[in-house]
């Protein structure tokens, strides 16, 4: 009886540890300068392809055309 109780408690402990590791690994974030997506967020700042403090707008040829 003692063996069964110990093995069940060890099994439950392993499940709890795996859930804890899953939460830690899925909630990580990336520092500035690292590639990011909406599913891989920045720790701080904004995701503009890479983690940055401010997104700079990039204009095409039509926007820079001068008469």
From Swiss-Prot:
Keywords recorded for this protein, A-Z: Amidation, Cleavage on pair of basic residues, Disulfide bond, Ion channel impairing toxin, Neurotoxin, Potassium channel impairing toxin, Secreted, Signal, Toxin, Voltage-gated potassium channel impairing toxin
GO MF annotation, one: toxin activity
Modified-residue entries (Phenylalanine amide), positions: 59
Protein localization: Secreted
PROSITE patterns xrefs: I_CONOTOXIN (PS60019)
One term under GO cellular component: extracellular region
Function of the molecule: Inhibits the vertebrate voltage-gated potassium channels Kv1.1/KCNA1 and Kv1.3/KCNA3.
Domain-related comment: The cysteine framework is XI (C-C-CC-CC-C-C).
Protein name as annotated: Kappa-conotoxin-like Em11.8
Organism expressing this protein natively: Conus emaciatus
Taxonomic path: Eukaryota, Metazoa, Spiralia, Lophotrochozoa, Mollusca
């Amino acid at each position: 009886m003692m063996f069964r109780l110990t093995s069940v408690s060890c099994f439950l402990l392993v499940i709890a540890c795996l859930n804890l590791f899953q939460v830690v690994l899925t909630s990580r974030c990336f520092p500035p300068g690292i590639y990011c997506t909406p599913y891989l967020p920045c720790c701080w700042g904004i995701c503009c392809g890479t983690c940055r403090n401010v997104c700079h707008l990039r204009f095409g040829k039509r926007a820079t055309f001068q008469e």
